[in-house]
């Protein structure tokens, strides 16, 4: 999910 990947840190 690229839209949620920004929160995968």
Swiss-Prot record:
One of its GO terms (cellular component) is extracellular region. Detected in the thoracic perisympathetic organs in larvae, and the dorsal ganglionic sheath in adults (at protein level). GO terms for biological process: neuropeptide signaling pathway. It is found in: Secreted. Its main location: secreted. The modification Phenylalanine amide is found at residue 9. Keywords: Amidation, Neuropeptide, Secreted. It comes from the Eukaryota. Belongs to the FARP (FMRFamide related peptide) family. This is FMRFamide-15. The lineage of its organism: Eukaryota, Metazoa, Ecdysozoa, Arthropoda, Hexapoda.
